[in-house]
Amino acid sequence: MFGELRDLLTGGGNETTTKKVKGTVVLMKKNVLDFNDFNASFLDRLHEFLGNKITLRLVSSDVTDSENGSKGKLGKAAHLEDWITTITSLTAGESAFKVTFDYETDFGYPGAFLIRNSHFSEFLLKSLTLEDVPGHGRVHYICNSWIYPAKHYTTDRVFFSNKTYLPHETPATLLKYREEELVSLRGTGEGELKEWDRVYDYAYYNDLGVPPKNPRPVLGGTQEYPYPRRGRTGRKPTKEDPQTESRLPITSSLDIYVPRDERFGHLKMSDFLAYALKAIAQFIQPALEAVFDDTPKEFDSFEDVLKIYEEGIDLPNQALIDSIVKNIPLEMLKEIFRTDGQKFLKFPVPQVIKEDKTAWRTDEEFAREMLAGLNPVVIQLLKEFPPKSKLDSESYGNQNSTITKSHIEHNLDGLTVEEALEKERLFILDHHDTLMPYLGRVNTTTTKTYASRTLLFLKDDGTLKPLVIELSLPHPNGDKFGAVSEVYTPGEGVYDSLWQLAKAFVGVNDSGNHQLISHWMQTHASIEPFVIATNRQLSVLHPVFKLLEPHFRDTMNINALARQILINGGGIFEITVFPSKYAMEMSSFIYKNHWTFPDQALPAELKKRGMAVEDPEAPHGLRLRIKDYPYAVDGLEVWYAIESWVRDYIFLFYKIEEDIQTDTELQAWWKEVREEGHGDKKSEPWWPKMQTREELVESCTIIIWVASALHAAVNFGQYPVAGYLPNRPTISRQYMPKENTPEFEELEKNPDKVFLKTITAQLQTLLGISLIEILSTHSSDEVYLGQRDSKEWAAEKEALEAFEKFGEKVKEIEKNIDERNDDETLKNRTGLVKMPYTLLFPSSEGGVTGRGIPNSVSI
């Protein structure tokens, strides 16, 4: 009591006391991740020794800095301790450093901190954790950002604690930091971007060609070639064409600009991916060309094809091997080539031929893969017979189907065509209208192919039976004269061989559609604008940023590598996929005529194809027209789990609709997605208006679904299903043999040889399976749906609990998938190839597993 009285009389007791607050910084030093930079570690230690340290300062959420406008008060500078002596690793190169702050007791909550790097090289800052902060206990900051030397920034870098704030809820002391951080991420829109830049900006796909010898049209920004935007690099235009951006040499592919925090850099697996892609483009392709220059470029039999899995391809060129060793870190070699450098390119046996080497050829498996294969997003309910084209008849003449009742009625298990239509038992795989506008041009290349329609019948046991295949060419006198079509049905003898060839042409159509549309355009390309807009317009403090950010990991990096090596003019896609140099142009045509944002929702997409119908009695009010449709059954479980989690989360932060309408960052984000990211579609009436919580829930669910589950469904089965190329040929090189010709005679004598001469050649086969093996591989540090790479991603207990509930639901889905795969009455789950459908099984280990839903389009 006397003490209190004394303080009252003397004004004592108000003085600020200082306490030591201890923290732990987790980071990865540059040399852990960089194979070639051995100097970085030494120079950083030298800088540290000379007093050039890493400095941190806390920022108060509660107390204003009188000298710094409305910004929060800054604490005293603190330094990372023991940089020189700390060599202990936590996991995969992570190091933990102590830091001690002088903490004034009236400082309040430390809502952010500033960091300055005075070392020679950059490091990856993972997190800062403070213990025993007066009045607040433990405070955690998630960073996951590269910190370059201070000379590369105009201000110190800022990081916020894991509390979540809508813009109007942000403490006034942090608001300026929040706004300034977004401004710096948007950049100025000028100049070439450098590796330390953090700028997210938009550009057209104008870097795919090399004029004048290998030009490609600019995709995006025109009515003729609309396209989603990609990340801007700011490279100069070519001298020959100011509309085309200059390209990096292939040897510098790994240096292509993406914002630094979007670049691969977790474990070796990410680097393995990048180096392996480079190896294919730079070394393996010319090596294979050299080997096959002196040998016939054909497989003579299916046994020949099997040898590439059982024996491997011998590349005896020692000079080539030496050049690979020089260009690829030694520790990568064994992983990429699986040998000591002599006989490489030996491939693992794809799952589709593991149990039975011939079941892939059956009609049952051909049909089953439309429901449970690589491209299960195309098959439709047939609503009219014969099928009609939607192409403009003035431009393309009569493109309607020439299939008649007599082609199929004998095969409908006693039903008439009308009855089969009425009972919803006829289905179509239709690659006619999407391909026909380009077919004449595609067939001027080495490709020789058709536009196809395949009709199928739903049998009583729930499986599909192929009935008929129609193969069409443009009229020789011009497109406007319509299509010239041939119809093929199952047969005996040589007619069975014709039927097998017809199925191969359907496979070629479907492979191209899968790779360019279902995979590249609908997941990789369409998601990138959301990645860019989210980083430009939503602060890391924003609840929607925290919701979506895990679903964007590595997407910009893999897409940039794709522009450099895969989808560019003369790149691996053009070499291995049938549309050749028209591949990307075709994907623009599909984006223009078929892509809408609301239809990316799985329920909407299934209804659009007639594969599902609203039914109040069915789970979630949706009934599948084919009950045993593995992609749709598993997919809907995953979709509704995502939607439920998103709704729980969004409703935590947005209590009323007005919260959505007055959220300045959210409205700017959605405006930019529509007007910039998908700017060629900005006037479409179907865009959600973003005025209600349900509109936000649906939009975020679509984004997460596309980035995670849809991408997994069309990507990670590539090697298991298509690694055996006769099952999913990607190119056709000669037309169907006609009766009374030498080609038809050869088909009668040696049907397998004709089949193999028709589909993908030996060189493209090896290139193609080299690529899809890499694309089907999970990295060892992958983060899967229902998981986060940090348990402290948010400070709000309710958000963490909602996510935990989602994680439990995901585990339940895994059990359900296992049970369905064990159910022998569900014949489409495994088929004659004895390959269970696991592409939407959420978790996986690393490698080629044919299962696992990573959070993002990360490969």
UniProtKB/Swiss-Prot annotation:
Pfam families for the chain: Lipoxygenase (PF00305), PLAT (PF01477)
Chain ranges of the PLAT domain: 21-161
Keyword terms: Cytoplasm, Dioxygenase, Fatty acid biosynthesis, Fatty acid metabolism, Iron, Lipid biosynthesis, Lipid metabolism, Metal-binding, Oxidoreductase, Oxylipin biosynthesis, Plant defense, Stress response
Induction remarks: By pathogens (e.g. Pseudomonas syringae), wounding, abscisic acid (ABA) and methyl jasmonate (MeJA). Higher levels in light than in dark conditions. Induced by infection with the fungal pathogen Fusarium graminearum.
Residue segments, region Disordered: 213-246
Main location: cytoplasm
Null mutant phenotype: Increment in the number of lateral roots, and moderate increase in the length of the primary root. Enhanced disease resistance to the fungal pathogen Fusarium graminearum. Enhanced susceptibility to the bacterial pathogen Pseudomonas syringae pv tomato DC3000. The double mutant plants lox1 and lox5 exhibit enhanced susceptibility to the bacterial pathogen Pseudomonas syringae pv tomato DC3000 and the biotrophic powdery mildew pathogen Golovinomyces cichoracearum.
Cofactor note: Binds 1 Fe cation per subunit. Iron is tightly bound.
Enzyme Commission numbers on file: 1.13.11.58
Known cofactor(s): Fe cation
Catalytic activities: (9Z,12Z)-octadecadienoate + O2 = (9S)-hydroperoxy-(10E,12Z)-octadecadienoate; (9Z,12Z,15Z)-octadecatrienoate + O2 = (9S)-hydroperoxy-(10E,12Z,15Z)-octadecatrienoate
Gene Ontology CC: plastid
Disulfide bridge map: none
Protein's name in the database: Linoleate 9S-lipoxygenase 1
Species per Swiss-Prot/TrEMBL record: Arabidopsis thaliana
